C-alpha cells in the first residue's frame, strides 16, 4: 500500500529521534493504514488492537492484539501492556472512549482520540468544513457530560 506522495515520501523516510511504542485501536480501516505506514516509516513500533475482521492481512509484521469493544472483557488483550502513545480511531459509541481511557490511563503516556466517523450532520454534501453542522448523537448537555467523563477517565 502506497499512502504517500513523492514529496511526502522524503519526510516519511526520516527516522524519529526517539522510537515510540504506539498502540493503534483499529488501524486497518479508513485512516488507520496511513497512520501505521507513517509510524513504521519513522521507526516506531506499532501494535494494532481490533477484532481482526477488517483487512486482517494488512501489516503481517505488526503485532496484532484481538479484542472487541462491544463485549465484557473486550480489552483483556491490553492488560499488562505499556505504550508511549495510543491512537484511538474506530469510535462509534461514546462509552468506547471512556472504557479505553479507563483501561489505558496508567499504561500510556499519551492518548489521542481521532473522530473520523459521523462527525457532521450531512453525509451528502461534498466539501464539508468545520463550519458545517455537527452530528450530535446525544443532546448537547449529554455530550458535554460524556466529554467530561471521558477526560476524567483518561486522566
What are these model-predicted stretches?
Residues 14-16, 38, 56:
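A generic structural signal for short, solvent-exposed coil/turn residues
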Residues 45-46:
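Short beta-strand element of Class I
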Residues 22, 28, 55-109, 113, ...:
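NAD(P)H-binding glycine-rich loop region in Rossmannoid oxidoreductase-like domains
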Residues 1-16:
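N-terminal twin-arginine translocation
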Residues 49-53:
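N-terminal Rossmann-fold cofactor-binding loop
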Residues 99-155:
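Conserved Rossmann-fold NAD(P)-dependent oxidoreductase catalytic core, especially the SDR/UDP-sugar
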Residues 21-42:
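N-terminal Rossmann NAD(P)H-binding glycine-rich loop of SDR-like oxidoreductase domains
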